[in-house]
Amino acid sequence: MPKNTKRKRLCPKMNQKLGLKDQDQEIFDLIEQEKARQKENILLIASENFVSQAVLDAQGSILTNKYAEGYPQARYYNGCKNVDQIEKIAIQRATKLFGAKYANVQPHSGSQANMGVFQALLKPGDKILGLSLMDGGHLTHGHKLSFSGGFYEAHFYNVNPQTEMLDYDEIRKVALAVKPKLIIAGYSAYSKTINFKKFRQIADEVNAYLIADIAHIAGLVACGLHPCPFEANADVVTSTMHKTLRGPRGGLILTNKEELFKKINRGIFPGIQGGPCIHTIAAKAVAFQEAMMPSFKEYQKQVIKNANTFAKAFQQKGYRIVSGSTDNHLFLIDVKHKNTEFTGAKIANMLEKINIVVNKNTIPFDQEKPFVTSGIRIGTPAMTTVGFRENDFVAVADLMDKAINHLDDESYLSQIKQQVLALLSKFNK
């Protein structure tokens, strides 16, 4: 090769200083479109919320560059001085917020938090007992398509057919018959207060672990607006971060029992995860700090007030609310009670056309398939964060009712959409 011939670069150097817009216009544009969608829609999905800029800053930080397999002061990698401190702060804040002795902040999601606990406390084939998915349970509480129904022998309790509320005498009967090793209390679509003390009594009677999954109500529990599972001596509490707790997407495990905590830590790492997402753990720490502020409790109080007012507004228009009322941040509407031709999917799809976003949801003893459903689920956390108050939710109920009564009238729906945008404009200044 001649001396002056330059070797052709096979892999052009990437300019790491470029911002997203300059580096990847396609993804940048889609994020901008999503940003606009979130501003231009009334978001009523109960499992969604808007995080603070501080949480976004932490989650989008350079901490994403660091690998930190293991736990603070027990890592398999060097260079973990700073991330050890961050994880310890997150743990300290989590335990203080929920009144627990021990916390694992590494689960990537609520599902993995549950999986880690099951891995720690159960053997394949052990019996578990949770609420039926159709009645408001969760996939990870024993559904056959989940690890919880695949690795373990899952059994279910139901809500009372008349009240659509938990029937603790019936749950006790099921537990005595099944003799589960683990009982799960906590739900994805249940609007009433959970009596953890009664669950503790049932669990003790059959010598079962009591696991409280507070993913949906964590923000309420943290503020004392819903009974805390630890007041009932729950063995383990699991949660997500991103619903009423208003944090980043991720999971959390809490316990007061040292031996269980050691097992749970092993269940998460090396049981089901490798390196934790330190940038997300930092964002969790920020969210825990925010949740300890007085303003956060006022926010949670407003979430409950808004949900209660919202549900009553629908009842006054002839809609049936599952279980009759709500004690928390969400409620279910039985749309078939309004019109037997309606389905949850049909109503949810129509509402999205007018910039109101809900999700289709099964209701207790639903005869429709899960992708069709007889109900819709509605939550108030996200729009309460935006600034909605009771009168705003009454206005939304009125708009939704008008749209539902003109389901197939595209011209009328277009007019309703403009009213939705006008309502939102007050909060987007």
Curated annotation (Swiss-Prot):
**What is the superkingdom listed in this entry's lineage?**
Bacteria
Q: Where is this site: Plays an important role in substrate specificity?
A: 242
List UniProt keywords, sorted A-Z.
Amino-acid biosynthesis, Cytoplasm, One-carbon metabolism, Pyridoxal phosphate, Transferase
**Where along this sequence does the record place binding of (6S)-5,6,7,8-tetrahydrofolate?**
133, 137-139, 259
GO CC, alphabetical: cytosol
**InterPro entries assigned:** PyrdxlP-dep_Trfase, PyrdxlP-dep_Trfase_major, PyrdxlP-dep_Trfase_small, Ser_HO-MeTrfase, Ser_HO-MeTrfase-like, Ser_HO-MeTrfase_PLP_BS, SHMT-like_dom
**Where in this protein does the record say N6-(pyridoxal phosphate)lysine is found?**
243
Entry's EC annotation: 2.1.2.1
Instruction: Give the GO terms filed under biological process for this record.
Output: glycine biosynthetic process from serine; tetrahydrofolate interconversion
Give me the reactions it catalyses.
(6R)-5,10-methylene-5,6,7,8-tetrahydrofolate + glycine + H2O = (6S)-5,6,7,8-tetrahydrofolate + L-serine
Names of the cofactor(s): pyridoxal 5'-phosphate
Recorded metabolic or biological pathway in which this protein acts: One-carbon metabolism; tetrahydrofolate interconversion; Amino-acid biosynthesis; glycine biosynthesis; glycine from L-serine: step 1/1
Cellular localisation: Cytoplasm
Q: Name one GO molecular function term.
A: pyridoxal phosphate binding
PANTHER family, A to Z: SERINE HYDROXYMETHYLTRANSFERASE, SERINE HYDROXYMETHYLTRANSFERASE 1
What family is it from?
Belongs to the SHMT family.
Under the subunit heading, UniProt states: Homodimer.
- Briefly, what is this protein's role? Catalyzes the reversible interconversion of serine and glycine with tetrahydrofolate (THF) serving as the one-carbon carrier. This reaction serves as the major source of one-carbon groups required for the biosynthesis of purines, thymidylate, methionine, and other important biomolecules. Also exhibits THF-independent aldolase activity toward beta-hydroxyamino acids, producing glycine and aldehydes, via a retro-aldol mechanism.
What name does this protein carry?
A: Serine hydroxymethyltransferase
Q: Which gene encodes it?
A: glyA
